[in-house]
């Protein structure tokens, strides 16, 4: 049994959270959304969900987290170091890896815990460029449930796709409900209201 699955099973054995999840094919690649992302604990739950499902997954983290002495452990747990100064390069790199057959689920938390300004669009661009399905993972403290919801295919019609996403997350509160933001990409906002585009 892998280190990640062992850690996940230990987590669920003692956790107060209830795992309510749909099945996801283990032998495929995809994007796994973790939302609402209102606390760092949301991300821990997403990793535990993916580990329990025995998915081969990776996640993105600040490059500073991968320095000694914890860098090796972070990579063993599926971490990919990210230099946020070059988000476009990261999208290209991940898309190329998947196209070459490096199949894995990429855990993404597009809603930053500090911004409160909606979702970043990196997950959408990666999913479209690599033709990957998107699985909607969730955290809902009001019911103390968490897990994987439906898997969708993005069509390229951003407002329509995000309407599907918003419908699913409408009753999901995250770990800290007061910090929840509406799932909305900047690309949905009219140009005159959008301000400076977010490269990530």
Please tell me what each predicted stretch does:
Residues 1, 5-16, 71, 75:
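Short hydrophobic helices that act as membrane-entry/anchoring signals
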Residues 1-2, 39-40, 64, 116-117:
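Short alpha-helix boundary/capping motifs
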Residues 3, 7, 14, 87-200:
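Non-catalytic C-terminal accessory region of glycerolipid acyltransferases
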Residues 10-28:
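N-terminal signal-anchor transmembrane helix
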Residues 12, 47-50, 74, 149, ...:
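Conserved protein kinase catalytic domain
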Residues 16, 54-56, 76, 103, ...:
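A generic structural signal for alpha->beta connector loops
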Residues 23-85, 141:
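Catalytic core of membrane glycerolipid acyltransferases/transacylases, capturing the structured
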């Amino acid at each position: 049994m892998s280190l990640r699955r062992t850690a996940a099973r230990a987590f669920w054995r003692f956790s107060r959270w209830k795992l309510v999840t749909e099945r996801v094919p283990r032998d495929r690649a995809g994007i796994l959304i973790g939302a609402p992302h209102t606390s760092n604990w949301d991300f821990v739950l997403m990793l535990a969900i993916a580990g329990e499902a025995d998915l081969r997954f990776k996640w993105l983290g600040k490059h500073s987290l991968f320095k000694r002495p914890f860098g090796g452990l972070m990579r063993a747990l599926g971490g990919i170091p990210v230099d946020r100064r070059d988000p476009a390069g990261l999208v290209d790199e991940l898309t190329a890896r998947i196209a070459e057959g490096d199949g894995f689920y990429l855990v993404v938390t597009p809603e930053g815990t500090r911004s409160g300004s909606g979702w970043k669009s990196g997950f959408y661009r990666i999913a479209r460029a690599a033709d990957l399905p998107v699985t909607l993972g969730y955290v809902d403290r009001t019911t103390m449930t968490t897990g994987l919801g439906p898997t969708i295919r993005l069509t390229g019609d951003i407002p329509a796709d995000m309407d599907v996403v918003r419908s699913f997350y409408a009753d999901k509160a995250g770990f800290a409900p007061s910090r929840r933001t509406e799932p909305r990409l900047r690309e949905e906002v009219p140009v005159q209201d959008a301000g400076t585009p977010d490269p990530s």
